[in-house]
């Protein structure tokens, strides 16, 4: 069911980020912001993964249509655009150095340690880290919190 949350996040993103732009412009906006979070380290797009994700997406389409039927999406959500953004997001590539800088940016309260640029609001970082803690490890989601038994919760 984690894909449902990611698909909903894409639907919300499309509604909230530069609402008067097309899908390509929205993706470029997101890509550039991720690049800033990564301190301009390597951030790529794998078209083969994108095409594979789109060609084998029956379950994601079914989930999307289920969510649409139940009026879960914001008004005027285009399901195909939402799923395309989801597939594009699944097709991003980073290396370990890039991932380390992205993690360090979160650990540094939203300030990229390599550029010194404040790229995320502290409140957004707090929310992202909370989501990552509870449901950001895919099939291992939630289990980490119970095994670690953190007292910060």
Model-predicted segments: where are they?
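Active-site-proximal alpha-helical segments within enzyme catalytic domains
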Residues: 8, 93-112
């Amino acid at each position: 069911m984690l894909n449902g949350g990611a698909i909903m996040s894409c639907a919300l993103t499309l509604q909230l980020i530069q609402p008067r732009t097309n899908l390509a412009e929205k993706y470029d906006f997101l890509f550039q912001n991720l690049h800033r979070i990564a301190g301009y380290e390597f951030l790529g797009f794998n078209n083969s993964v994108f095409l594979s994700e789109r060609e084998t997406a029956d379950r994601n389409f079914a989930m999307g249509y289920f969510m649409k039927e139940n009026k879960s999406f914001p008004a005027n959500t285009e399901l195909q655009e939402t799923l395309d953004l989801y597939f594009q997001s699944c097709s991003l590539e980073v290396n370990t150095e890039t991932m380390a800088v992205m993690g360090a940016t979160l650990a540094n309260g939203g300030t990229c340690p390599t550029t010194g640029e404040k790229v995320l609001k502290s409140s957004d970082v707090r929310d992202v880290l909370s989501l990552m803690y509870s449901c950001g490890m895919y099939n291992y989601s939630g289990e980490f919190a119970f095994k670690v038994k953190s007292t910060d919760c």
